[in-house]
């Protein structure tokens, strides 16, 4: 029920700077016009929001001058002029905000859609080894938790941080413009807020990253338990299952609690420090004005009440922006962690393709095999040579293994010196206990894994020279664990060959013995299947799987324990379908029920990755060796 997992910790994490750079670079590639417009809108909005303090100082100065001179007529025009300018800037800021928020919404959702497409497309190019070593729940987490974390970062946090940074820069410049001494007082006070943010925010961020990883672990565990729920109930392991889930669930609770504990502690501290700074600035401003301390500024203006009031306003503004940065840190950290995992998936090495021999439709003209532009039902290997010539070799289904060694992990060989020969049309059966290497051999035939030593030839061609897509089209497979997709019965059969007509699919279903039960379904071949065809019996699902393989009409078939999980009566029905499928084509069969392989042309007995016996059923019984012991029940396959 469990599978070997290869966690992301086995791959080095990218530096934070590189992750952010790569994220922004990809956003720019996706939206080279809209992204800069949206970001420019955020910058303009920030600048517009920083200007009120300047206009407030001007208006207060004008009113102060009016009080001194008593000439309201000239002051009135200046006040309304500044108010009008301020209102204009507010309108510009509002429009910039609309452009920024709407633009970033489009960029964010569009980028996530493109990332999901890239991830899914790349996932189709990954080798089977990747899926054999990663939990389904962990893979699903890429598309849910990690993408959602990126959404928060790109759509909200990064624009807010850009906006906040511009506001802080503008406010600091304005502060120094009016009073360098007061600006340094403010910056010193807010440096304390920076220290609090660094310490508490850093601890909070680390725990948020752990929360994200542990959430993926919980999802993977739930997925695994859902897939194995029947096994849990068969062995009455409900209590142990609950205990194992509680352990990982408790871990999630602890890291999530710590993350929120630090985050919830940080914000009150920052708010109170901001309030304290406001009081400090007010007191220091009063001292400056009362003692008439000489002001040092870029403007050359004295430090008056007209400067003190906007300075207090800027202090509030500065404090609010520091709080805003602190509140976005966790979102950015989680977004970076999510982006790191997404990029790890995108950076996973794709399945290599060094083959150049392809599979083509063929026809014979004047005794020569030539490529056909239409489906002929006759296949040939197209073998291009270095001199520009092309050789067409008819596909016969001649499969040979020469001294093959293989191991899933370096230094751990599971197949030793495997040599066998399947003539065209022969039925070769693999027999042996679990772990003997039966399924591993079939994984090598279709190059889900590559051999370490030896050779495998298909119609005399080294399979390393055949393109994997062509090789797999020439190999049909019926697995014990049937996978049916959401769609009609017809769609699921057609999955074997996407250009198959409805008539081709019905013909394949009849060959597999599935036509009768399909026509009894509510909508026949157009009946919708969902949840892996859960409304069908195991035998019916298996028959559809056989029909899917039949419509592909490959010259070589692999039947991997295709009847081991169904009852004897259903097996007889399925067996008839498989017999029809195997007729006149090379077939490799793996079965736990030896009765299904009695009529095999060659039976290969495997033990710990080695061939220990081979021959026909009668020949092996006469030897009274391992096969004899298995057949008579002295040995068990499982």
Which residues make up each language-model segment?
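Juxtamembrane helix-loop junctions of ABC transporter transmembrane domains
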Residues: 9-16, 40, 48-64, 88-136, ...
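ABC-type nucleotide-binding domain
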Residues: 72, 362-638
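Helix-loop-helix
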Residues: 65-67, 174-188, 262-340, 345-349, ...
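An intracellular "coupling" helix at the cytosolic face of ABC transporter transmembrane type-1 domains
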Residues: 25, 29-32, 128-129, 147-154, ...
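Transmembrane helix-loop-helix hairpins at lipid-water interfaces of multipass membrane proteins
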Residues: 33-96, 176-181, 283, 290-302
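Membrane-integrated ABC transporters
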Residues: 1-49, 64-85, 100-104, 108, ...
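Transmembrane helices of ABC transporter permease
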Residues: 30, 34-44, 159-210, 283-303, ...
């Amino acid at each position: 029920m469990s599978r070997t997992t290869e966690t992301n910790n086995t791959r080095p994490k990218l530096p934070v700077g590189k992750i952010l750079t790569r994220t922004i670079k990809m956003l720019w590639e996706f939206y080279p016009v809209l992204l800069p417009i949206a970001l420019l809108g955020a910058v303009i909005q920030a600048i517009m929001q920083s200007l009120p303090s300047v206009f407030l100082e001007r208006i207060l100065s004008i009113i102060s001058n009016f009080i001194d001179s008593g000439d309201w007529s000239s002051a009135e025009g200046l006040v309304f002029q500044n108010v009008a300018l301020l209102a204009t800037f507010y309108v510009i800021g509002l429009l910039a905000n609309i452009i920024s928020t709407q633009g970033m919404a489009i960029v964010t959702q569009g980028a996530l859609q493109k990332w999901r497409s890239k991830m899914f497309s790349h996932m189709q190019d990954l080798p089977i080894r990747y899926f054999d070593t990663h939990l389904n729940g962990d893979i699903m987490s890429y598309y849910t938790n990690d993408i959602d974390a990126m959404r928060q970062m790109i759509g909200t946090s990064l624009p807010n941080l850009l906006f906040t940074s511009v506001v802080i820069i503008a406010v600091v410049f304005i502060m120094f413009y009016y009073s360098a001494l007061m600006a340094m007082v403010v910056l010193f006070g807010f440096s304390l807020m920076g220290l609090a943010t660094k310490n508490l925010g850093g601890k909070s961020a680390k725990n948020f990253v752990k929360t994200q990883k542990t959430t993926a672990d919980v999802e993977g565990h739930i997925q695994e338990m859902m897939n194995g729920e029947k096994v849990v109930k068969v062995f009455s392991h409900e209590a142990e299952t609950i205990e194992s889930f509680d352990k990982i669930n408790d871990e999630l609770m602890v890291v999530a609690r710590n993350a929120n504990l630090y985050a919830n502690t940080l914000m009150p501290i920052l708010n109170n420090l901001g309030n304290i700074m406001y009081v400090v600035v007010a007191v220091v401003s009063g001292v400056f004005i009362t003692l008439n301390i000489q002001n040092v500024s870029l403007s050359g203006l004295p430090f008056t009440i007209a400067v003190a009031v906007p300075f207090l306003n800027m202090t509030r503004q500065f404090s609010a922006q520091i709080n805003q940065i602190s509140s976005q840190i966790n979102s950015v950290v989680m977004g970076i962690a999510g982006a790191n995992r997404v990029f790890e998936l995108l950076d996973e090495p794709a399945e290599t393709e060094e083959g150049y021999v392809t599979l083509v439709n063929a026809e014979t003209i004047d005794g020569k095999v030539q490529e056909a532009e239409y489906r002929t039902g006759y296949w040939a290997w197209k073998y291009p040579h270095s001199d520009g010539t092309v050789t067409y070799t008819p596909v016969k289904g001649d499969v040979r293994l020469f001294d093959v060694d293989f191991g899933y992990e370096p230094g751990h060989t599971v197949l030793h010196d495997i040599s066998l020969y399947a003539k065209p049309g022969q039925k070769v059966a693999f027999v042996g206990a679990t772990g003997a290497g039966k399924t591993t051999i079939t994984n090598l035939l279709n190059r889900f894994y590559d051999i370490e030593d030896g050779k495998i030839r298909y119609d005399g061609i080294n399979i390393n020279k055949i393109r994997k897509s062509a090789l797999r089209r020439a190999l049909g497979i019926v697995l014990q664990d049937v996978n049916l997709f959401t769609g009609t019965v017809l769609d699921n059969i057609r999955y074997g060959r996407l250009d198959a007509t409805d008539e081709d699919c019905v013909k394949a279903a009849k060959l597999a013995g599935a036509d009768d039960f399909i026509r009894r379904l509510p909508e026949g071949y157009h009946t919708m299947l969902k949840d892996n065809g859960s409304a069908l019996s195991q035998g019916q699902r298996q028959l559809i799987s056989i029909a899917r393989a039949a419509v592909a009409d490959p010259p070589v078939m692999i039947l991997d324990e295709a009847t081991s999980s169904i009852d004897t009566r259903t097996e007889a029905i399925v067996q008839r379908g498989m017999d029809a499928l195997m007729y006149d084509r090379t077939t490799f069969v793996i079965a736990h029920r030896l009765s299904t392989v009695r009529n095999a042309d060659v039976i290969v007995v495997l033990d710990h990755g080695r061939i220990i016996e081979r021959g026909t059923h009668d020949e092996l019984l006469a030897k009274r060796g391992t096969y004899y012991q298995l057949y008579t029940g002295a040995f068990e396959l499982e």
